[in-house]
């Protein structure tokens, strides 16, 4: 009976995601649609790349005028474009049967919906490994998969969606390694995550560093007689295997970039040159004003532009070109949710440390996960201060998975607190969990069908 109910919930979990994601993916406009601006951020500029691949059957170098963003003077094709390659070649196949612009756009967007669906499945696998209580396991799964902004990322043409899938793969691989030990299966999971991350999104490269550090540390073992030993043989065996798979997966792209872009592996230097040459004055690197160039401090930037508030609200949910927001109560509810999670996580750490000594391996694992949370935050603030002010919460989404793990673990520990030997009654805990589910699922349904859908229906699927 329990297995049957598990399958039902799992099916509803995936179908709910698909219903919400497809509603957005099939109805939101592509081109700028003032004054409502229901179109996703920069999708029209990103979509140029799969369109180019569909038309010519080859990957653009990023130097072609056809894929250049007119105002900014550079192309997203200079960056890692693996998701666009997948979209472009599938579009090329679909174009054999129809030349409909709508069908081709849907094809590209549905690739990212598929990435989101795969991520939802892996999040379910992670939940099974880290939560024994079914209630909190499902709360974790829904918190990750149904966060409005996270779901939104899987509905339009971008590289963020593939990146989020890659972070789930890497976290799952690390959990399996630390629970079951290293083997070929876990090595392939890790390799796949690293490949997708390396070929999709720079902001998540911290996960690759974390994977390397945690992999190397795994082979450091404490001996019963005291001291430590290191299994060099096994580390080299699996390390070389993972490195070989990763190099096969990503080597072609960086070799190509080195040749095509005159040694510019990441495309950043070429982007700078193109922006200087072609960008309009307001966004040209030579004339563009940043908070750093104007002599402001980071804290003055925070105070003047409400940076942290903007990041939080758009991390929870901001559809369109950051033009469609949820109810104010949605963001207030998430503030309470995160506050409860943080307090619970800290209490858990204090009480857990009092009961038993935390091993060095556990400390190192959690420090790495915290690093994966804070690195995207640091990079977002750094770029906003030094390069181009954009306090968009979507840049923080690589931190979503470990962040939600600690939040749900914290809420779980809050529910287990005892006073004079007495714990909260089960009905009260269940009521609290139900409220969390209401915030997560109800808030997302409200965002999609009450806030966003009327905008999409009013503007229509504008293609150009």
What function would you assign to each model-found segment?
Residues 1-28, 220, 231-245, 350-367, ...:
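Start-transfer (signal-anchor) and selected internal transmembrane alpha helices
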Residues 5-43, 52-60, 242-259, 374-378, ...:
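Transmembrane signal-anchor helices characteristic of membrane glycosylation enzymes that use polyprenol
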Residues 99-102, 123-146, 165:
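Transmembrane-helix signature of polytopic, membrane-embedded enzymes
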Residues 106-130, 169:
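Transmembrane-helix motifs of polytopic, lipid-linked glycan transferases
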Residues 149-163:
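Short acidic/glycine- and proline-prone juxtamembrane loop motifs at membrane-interface regions
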Residues 176-179, 207-246, 260, 270:
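Perimembrane helix-loop-helix junctions
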Residues 186-202, 248:
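Membrane-interface alpha helices of multi-pass inner-membrane proteins
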Residues 237-345, 446-451:
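Membrane-lumen/periplasm interface segments of specific transmembrane helices
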């Amino acid at each position: 009976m329990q297995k049957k109910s598990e399958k039902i919930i799992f099916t509803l979990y995936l179908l709910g995601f698909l219903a919400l994601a497809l509603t957005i993916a099939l109805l939101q406009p592509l081109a700028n649609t003032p004054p409502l601006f229901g179109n996703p951020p920069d999708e029209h500029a990103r979509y140029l790349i799969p369109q180019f691949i569909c038309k010519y059957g080859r990957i653009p170098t990023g130097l072609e005028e056809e894929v250049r963003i007119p105002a900014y003077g550079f192309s997203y094709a200079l960056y890692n474009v693996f998701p666009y390659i997948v979209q472009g070649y599938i579009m090329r196949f679909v174009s054999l049967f129809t030349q409909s612009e709508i069908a081709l756009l849907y094809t590209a967007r549905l690739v990212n919906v598929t990435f989101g669906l795969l991520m939802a499945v892996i999040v379910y696998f992670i939940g099974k490994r880290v939560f024994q209580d079914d209630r909190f396991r499902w709360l974790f799964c829904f918190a990750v998969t149904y966060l409005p902004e996270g779901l939104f990322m899987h509905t339009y043409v971008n590289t963020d969606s593939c990146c989020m899938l890659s972070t789930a793969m890497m976290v799952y691989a690390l959990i399996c390694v630390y629970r079951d030990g290293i083997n070929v299966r876990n090595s392939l999971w890790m390799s796949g995550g690293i490949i997708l991350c390396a070929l999709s999104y720079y902001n998540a490269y911290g996960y690759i560093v974390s994977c390397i550090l945690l992999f190397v540390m795994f082979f450091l073992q404490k001996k019963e007689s005291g001291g430590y030993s290191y299994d060099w043989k096994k580390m080299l065996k699996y390390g070389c295997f993972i490195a070989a798979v990763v190099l096969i997966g990503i080597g072609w792209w960086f070799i190509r970039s080195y040749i095509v872009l005159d040694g510019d592996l990441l495309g950043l230097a070429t982007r700078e040159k193109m922006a200087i040459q072609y960008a309009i004055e307001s966004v040209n690197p030579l004339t563009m004003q940043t908070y750093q160039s104007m002599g402001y401090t980071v804290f003055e930037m925070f105070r003047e532009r409400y940076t942290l508030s903007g990041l939080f609200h758009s991390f929870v949910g901001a559809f369109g070109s950051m033009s469609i927001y949820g109810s104010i109560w949605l963001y207030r509810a998430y503030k309470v949710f995160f506050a409860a999670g943080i307090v619970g996580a800290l209490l858990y750490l204090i009480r857990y440390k009092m009961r038993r000594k935390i091993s060095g391996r556990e400390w190192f694992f959690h420090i790495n996960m915290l690093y994966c949370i804070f690195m995207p935050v640091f990079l977002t603030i750094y770029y906003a201060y030094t390069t181009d002010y954009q306090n968009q919460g979507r840049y923080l989404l690589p931190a979503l998975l470990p962040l939600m793990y600690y939040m749900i673990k914290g809420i779980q520990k809050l529910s287990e607190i005892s006073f004079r030997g007495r714990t909260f009654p089960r009905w009260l805990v269940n009521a609290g969990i139900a409220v969390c589910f209401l915030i997560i699922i109800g808030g997302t349904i409200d965002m999609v069908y009450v806030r966003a859908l009327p905008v999409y229906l009013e503007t229509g699927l504008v293609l150009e």
